[in-house]
Amino acid sequence: VRQFRTLMKSMSKFPVSFRVGDTAYNGFGRDFTELGRTLENTDTSETTTVRFLYKDSIEIKLICTLYPYHAAYEWTVYFTNIGNENSPAISEINGCNYTLTAANPHLSGILGDGGYDNQANTPYDMNISGMELVINNETGRATYNRFPYFKLKWNGGGAFFAVGWPGQWR
């Protein structure tokens, strides 16, 4: 819950990255005007929607939901061209661009349902100390070679991650 609250306080450091035209962005900094926030509470969740405007032509909607009883949160980013002209290309979208600094990190998961010879659904656990690790599917089928569900554990903690998007992910 504390980490979610910290994320929501500083949009310029929000862990998403993307390009608009030739310009790379990490978070929603000075080129993004915050248009407003809404908060919706239910018995089990708290959803904050933040709307931004980029150069009068692209609206970005960031929907973040906290599930406090499960110590979990999620977010989705939407880009909409609201101008009268074509917008610059939006590319290289990383929906979660996060750097972990932790002692003895291990990544666990299972191989997906294709690709590796006769190894579908095989569990793996690897020490990722000192690695820059990029995992992606290779075809457009979300579960090809690796399932997009991971357990990350380190000395004193851990987390589950899921890439909730069909098709290409990285």
What are these regions (language model features)?
Residues 1-54, 58-170:
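Polysaccharide-binding surfaces and accessory modules of carbohydrate-active proteins
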